[in-house]
Amino acid sequence: MISFKQKLFFVLYTVLGNSTIFGATFPVLPEFQVYHTVGSRGSTYTTGALGISLHLFDDPSGPGRYLHVLALSIPEKTIAWKSKVGSLYLSEKASGFEIGVHDQWQMPAGKGATLSLRKIQWPKVHEGDNEPEEASSDILHMGWNWITGTPIITVWLLGLDIANLNLPHDRKQEIQIALGLRTAF
């Protein structure tokens, strides 16, 4: 009897193993983002994101649609400031993931929009001299991107987020704004 894991592996092997079909139907593109976020409850942090975008389809009269999956990394501090979530400072690097859809238009070139969900784990956050504790964030991200000229050198990213901050002794909602750069496709 074939187990569920074996069946799943066989299906994945069949789809992914035939690179001609997989590559022609669903091209996979690398994606990189870096952006700085500020929030209405005091959050301020810089995020680096690395992952892939899977091309789903092109709308003949509109955008191409991509499914993206990103690994997120937030350092304890950057050049000019310490990272904060709400009013709490990070004691070590945080990480998370993002999954969402991204629409990218050809005309006008560089115009795009994203809707995604993010989950960030803040392993050690503290306020003052208090003992560091764990926190997390669940974020609904809405983003827009555009280019500043041709040839395409810079793709700007603007984000508006609604975040649920699950802090050690409190839960808060926060509106966040982010500005950064992303890869072009």
Feature annotation, model-predicted:
Residues 172-185:
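Outer-membrane beta-barrel "beta-signal"
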Residues 1-27, 185:
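Cleavable N-terminal export/targeting peptides
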Residues 48-54, 99-101, 140-144, 177-179:
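Membrane-embedded beta-strands of outer-membrane beta-barrel proteins
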Residues 34-40, 56, 71-80, 105, ...:
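Transmembrane beta-strands of outer-membrane beta-barrel pores
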Residues 38-42, 75-94, 122-136, 166-170:
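Flexible, solvent-exposed loop segments that connect beta-strands
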Residues 20-86:
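Short glycine/proline- and aromatic-enriched beta-strand/turn motifs that initiate or cap beta-hairpins
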Residues 28-34, 67-74, 99, 113-117, ...:
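Membrane-embedded beta-strand positions of outer-membrane beta-barrel proteins
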Residues 22-28, 56-67, 104-113, 146-157, ...:
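Short loop/turn motifs that connect adjacent beta-strands in outer-membrane beta-barrel proteins
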